[in-house]
């Protein structure tokens, strides 16, 4: 499935139906009074969060959405039916912005959540509404009110518990495919991953969602490369898994480049809990591993884990560390006891 995380769409709610001019006509009643009904309200435009979606690709092919006009009023004081609504189905984590792509309208984070983006126009009054003591047979009715029209932006921020970050070829895609059922493209060249991938990790009876974010390079926050566009997807993550390839000559510099990009991007990304791990250690000798681990520890000031997605050495330790942090975060969010036995 192709991935699209941003789309501009044009929406319009339905016009209200017109009121009716009608008079009661029955046998033996020569002068029936007015009985024109009101017009129905126009249809609304809604955004609805549905399960099973993780892209906005449908909005690449259709950008214009218009709800139905309300039904016209009829005789016998019959109100026109309401116009049909239009529902924009979106994935969990979709944010909706005004046309300026800056002003937030709503943030949709739960399946079943919905938001009315445009309200249908009210129906017009039928002639029955205009009856007065001095005008018992009005021949006047109102047209319905026009619906609302606006352009909006849909922007998807994937909701994952953990986000994989690192330079291109840090082994993120290999890691994801090794620990989940996700099948991202894996190859020996930079920028293999061109859009985020999600996978579910299961370990020790626990599970969490892991996102593979396209590799960052120096200057990404200024638009260099492709990773800066997707940093928004890790804003909701509870923990960042920062991978540094053991094949990097200067692992400390590789770590610092990504940290700088996270800090420059802002939105508190650099404040998130981080697990630092040296990947692809199957390519190193025991002595080389220790040297690079020590070099990383000096700049990170925290423990540095090591693993190989190929040999699976150290892999479960990394997953358990991530699952532990995520579980603590979930308990804190629920206001429960954050201790884990």
Curated annotation (Swiss-Prot):
A biological process from GO: ribosome biogenesis
Named cofactor requirement(s): Mg(2+)
Function: An essential GTPase which binds GTP, GDP and possibly (p)ppGpp with moderate affinity, with high nucleotide exchange rates and a fairly low GTP hydrolysis rate. Plays a role in control of the cell cycle, stress response, ribosome biogenesis and in those bacteria that undergo differentiation, in morphogenesis control.
Subcellular localization: Cytoplasm
Enzyme Commission code(s) on record: 3.6.5.-
Gene3D superfamilies tied to this protein: GTP1/OBG domain (2.70.210.12), P-loop containing nucleotide triphosphate hydrolases (3.40.50.300)
Keywords, comma-separated and alphabetical: Cytoplasm, GTP-binding, Hydrolase, Magnesium, Metal-binding, Nucleotide-binding
Keyword Transmembrane assigned: no
Subunit structure as annotated in this protein's UniProt entry: Monomer.
Protein name per UniProt: GTPase Obg
Protein family per UniProt: Belongs to the TRAFAC class OBG-HflX-like GTPase superfamily. OBG GTPase family.
Pfam family, one: MMR_HSR1
Occurrences of domain Obg (ranges): 1-159
OBG-type G domain sequence ranges: 160-327
Chain sites annotated for binding Mg(2+): 173, 193
Molecular function via GO: GTP binding; GTPase activity; magnesium ion binding
InterPro entries: G_OBG, GTP-bd, GTP-bd_Obg/CgtA, GTP1-OBG_CS, GTP1_OBG_dom, GTP1_OBG_dom_sf, OBG_GTPase, P-loop_NTPase
EC top class, as a word: hydrolase
């Amino acid at each position: 499935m192709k991935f699209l995380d941003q789309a501009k769409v044009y929406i319009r709610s339905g016009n209200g139906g017109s009121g009716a001019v009608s008079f009661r006509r029955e046998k033996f009643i020569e002068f029936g009074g007015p009985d024109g009904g009101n017009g129905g309200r126009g249809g609304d435009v809604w955004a609805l969060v549905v399960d099973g979606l993780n892209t906005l690709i449908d909005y690449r092919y259709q950008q214009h959405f218009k709800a139905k006009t309300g039904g016209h009023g009829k005789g016998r004081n019959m109100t026109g039916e309401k116009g049909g609504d239009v529902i924009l189905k979106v994935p969990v984590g979709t944010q909706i912005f005004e046309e300026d792509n800056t002003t937030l309208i709503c943030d949709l984070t739960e399946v079943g959540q919905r938001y009315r983006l445009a309200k249908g126009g009210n129906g017009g009054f039928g002639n029955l509404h205009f009856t007065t003591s001095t005008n018992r047979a009005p021949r006047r009715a109102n047209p319905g009110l026009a619906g609302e029209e606006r352009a909006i932006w849909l922007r998807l921020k994937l909701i994952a518990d953990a986000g994989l970050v690192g330079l291109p070829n840090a082994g993120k895609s290999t890691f994801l495919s090794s620990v989940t059922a996700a099948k991202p493209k894996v190859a020996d060249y930079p920028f293999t991953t061109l859009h985020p991938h999600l996978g579910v990790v299961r370990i020790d009876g626990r599970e969490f969602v892991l996102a593979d974010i396209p590799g960052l390079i120096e200057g990404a926050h200024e638009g260099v490369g492709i990773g800066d566009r997707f940093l928004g997807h890790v804003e909701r993550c509870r923990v960042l898994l920062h991978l540094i390839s053991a094949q990097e000559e200067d692992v400390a510099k590789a770590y610092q480049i990504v940290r700088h990009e996270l800090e420059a991007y802002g939105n508190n990304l650099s404040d998130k809990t981080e697990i630092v791990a040296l990947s692809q250690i199957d390519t190193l000798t025991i002595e080389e591993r220790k040297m690079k681990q020590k070099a990383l520890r000096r700049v990170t000031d925290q423990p540095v884990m090591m693993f190989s997605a190929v040999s699976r050495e150290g892999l479960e330790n990394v997953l358990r560390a991530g699952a532990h942090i995520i579980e603590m975060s979930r308990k804190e969010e629920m206001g429960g006891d954050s201790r884990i036995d």
